[in-house]
Every structure is written in structure tokens, then in C-alpha cells.
Regions:
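Alpha-helical interface subdomain recognition
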Residues: 1-84, 187-328
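FAD-binding core of flavoproteins
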Residues: 85-94, 98-208, 212
Length: 328
């Protein structure tokens, strides 16, 4: 496979990075977690802006009002979202935008905030429940649409990621079947790749943060980046990030053109390597920052916590590794 980005893809990534850094910079990110009246709340104005840039309609056909691109381009966009810790059910709303009818239109345009949960794993942990306009449930029968206002649950008092409020739910209304089993399976694959792309963005940003700190922090009369142990940590972070990048890009290309490889193997590998890079880089970045890395004021812990949350979505490490082993 050729992973060299086309000029259009480079322009897309550059434009999305400029938008993300301009509309959700560090000051806004910290304000959301430090001073927001409701921690982890979905900013509806920002959600609409994301929709206007094509975050949710990227893969919707042009004749249906979308951008008409593929999973490869979506992965580039979601990698950038991961770099700045954009909050909210981004992947779920992106997937919902492909549905026919009003829900798909509302998701694509940013009118609706849509959640997604795998109905085979109990008890359910539903993210952003209070902010949702619709909840989609992946089941053995396909995809069911549930009214989130009819869902009863217990909010988790201190969620791992302060940007991601979670509600524990023991049962769900039956809802309405809106898509078949094949669509549900395809959503699982695309969702895993886009979540892997978010993890790739997190891993890359953590590498940048650690190396920048290592260049600036002085100890014993020299910058700590000159010490071999710190060099090795930063180098290992970069290697993990680039391995994850290759895996995520390969999976995205494979979903766009299954003839180039085995989609199941590619998707599982992308999610495994993305999760591994993000979570391990979070731990190594904390170590590079020393005692400062454990403080609330340094952003490393926010990236690590988000990585832990993503690592539970679309299959955890053990589940995905067993599934990958079964294909060999």
C-alpha cells in the first residue's frame, strides 16, 4: 500500500488542524474541564461548526448532501480531533449520518448529537446520555434506535475522563430497528478504525508534549532530553505512534477497498496498535514530565484518561487480540 497522502488529503488534514486548534485550543479545553457548569457538556455551537466542516458528513454521498469521501479521509480528520481532545460522541454521530431519513440528515448537519452503544455488553455504560438526541444500539439483529429520554440509569460520579460523562444502565427500551446486521457489522469496523485514529492523534500529541518538555526542562545543569533514559522514552513513543499510524491508515484504505487486504485483520490491528500507542505514550509522557506529570495543571493526564476511555470502545485489548489470533 502507498500511504503517501495526496495533495487533497494534505490540504484536508491541514485545514482540519487549523480549525481544531483555532476553535478548541488549550484555553478552551481547560475551561471546559476546569470551569464548565456541567463537566463534559457538549457545546452545541461547536457541534454545529464541526458539522459545517464536514466532520459528520465526510462519507455521505455528495448527491445526499455529504462530502463524498472515504474512510481514509475520515481517519485523517479524526486523528486531528484526537490531537486536541475534541469532546463528544464524534464517531457515533459520524456513523449515524449515513442513515437514511431525518436522523441521518440531523446527524450530518449537527442538529442531532447521537450516541452509540454495543447492546451485547452489560451493564451498559452510555456516554453523554444527558446530551443525546438519539441513542443507537448495536445488537445481533442490527441497529436499534432508542429514545435517550426513556433510558433510566445512574450517572457515574467520577468518570475516568472528565470530558466524558458516563451513565450506567441495566436495561434499555426495545426501540426501533433502523438498520440490518450487515450495517451493524460495518459500523463496528468503521467505528474501530476512527477510534483508532483518535488514539493515533492522542499518541502523536503526547509524543510532541514529551519531547518539547525534554528540550526545555533542565536538571543537573543540562536539559533532560540529553539523558539517555529520557531519549529512549521519547524514541519509543515515536516508534509506537508511527506503527499505529501505519496500522490505522492501512485499515482505512482496506475498508475503502477490501481487495487490498483482509478488512477484519486490518481493523483489529489498527484498534490494537492505536490503543497501545495512546495508553503507553500517556504513561511514558507522564514519566518524562516527572513530578509535574502527575499534576492537574499539566495536560498529560487528560490525554491518558481519554486514551483509556477509547481503549474500551469497539473492543478492548484482550477481546481484539483474541479475535485477531482467531484469524491466523
Amino acid at each position: 500500500m502507498d500511504f503517501q497522502l495526496s495533495e487533497d488529503q494534505r490540504d484536508l488534514r491541514s485545514g482540519v488542524r487549523e480549525f481544531c486548534e483555532g476553535r478548541f485550543d488549550r484555553d478552551r479545553m481547560r475551561a471546559l474541564v476546569d470551569t464548565a457548569p456541567v463537566p463534559g457538556m457538549v457545546d452545541r455551537a461547536l457541534w454545529k461548526e464541526l458539522a459545517e466542516t464536514g466532520f459528520f458528513s465526510l462519507r455521505v454521498a455528495e448527491e445526499d448532501g455529504g462530502v463524498g469521501l472515504g474512510v481514509a479521509e475520515a481517519a485523517l480528520v479524526y486523528e486531528e480531533a484526537g490531537r486536541v481532545l475534541l469532546p463528544g460522541p464524534l464517531v457515533a454521530t459520524h456513523l449515524a449520518a449515513s442513515l437514511p431519513g431525518d436522523l441521518g440528515t440531523d446527524a450530518a448537519s449537527g442538529v442531532a448529537v447521537v450516541g452509540l452503544v454495543d447492546g451485547d455488553v452489560w451493564p451498559l455504560l452510555i456516554e453523554h446520555l444527558d446530551a443525546l438526541d438519539a441513542l443507537l444500539v448495536l445488537t445481533d439483529e442490527g441497529i436499534r434506535l432508542v429514545d435517550p429520554s426513556a433510558v433510566q440509569g445512574v450517572p457515574v460520579g467520577h468518570p475516568v475522563d472528565p470530558f466524558t460523562p458516563v451513565t450506567a444502565v441495566d436495561e434499555l427500551p426495545a426501540g426501533e430497528l433502523v438498520a440490518d446486521v450487515a450495517t451493524a457489522e460495518q459500523w463496528r469496523r468503521i467505528g474501530a478504525v476512527l477510534t483508532g485514529a483518535l488514539q493515533l492523534g492522542i499518541a502523536g500529541r503526547l509524543t510532541e508534549m514529551a519531547t518539547q518538555y525534554a528540550k526545555e526542562r533542565e536538571q543537573f545543569g543540562r536539559v533532560i532530553g540529553g539523558f539517555q533514559a529520557v531519549k529512549h522514552l521519547c524514541a519509543e513513543m515515536l516508534v509506537r505512534t508511527e506503527i499505529a499510524r501505519a496500522a490505522v491508515y492501512a485499515a482505512a484504505v482496506t475498508l475503502d477497498d477490501p481487495a487490498v487486504g483482509d478488512p477484519e485483520v486490518a481493523v483489529l490491528t489498527a484498534k490494537i496498535m492505536g490503543d497501545d500507542a495512546a495508553t503507553k505514550n500517556g504513561k511514558d509522557a507522564t514519566q518524562v514530565h516527572g513530578g509535574m506529570g502527575f499534576t492537574w495543571e499539566v495536560d498529560v493526564h487528560l490525554y491518558l484518561k481519554r486514551a483509556w476511555v477509547h481503549a474500551t470502545q469497539f473492543g478492548g485489548a484482550e477481546e481484539n487480540e483474541e479475535a485477531l489470533a482467531a484469524t491466523l
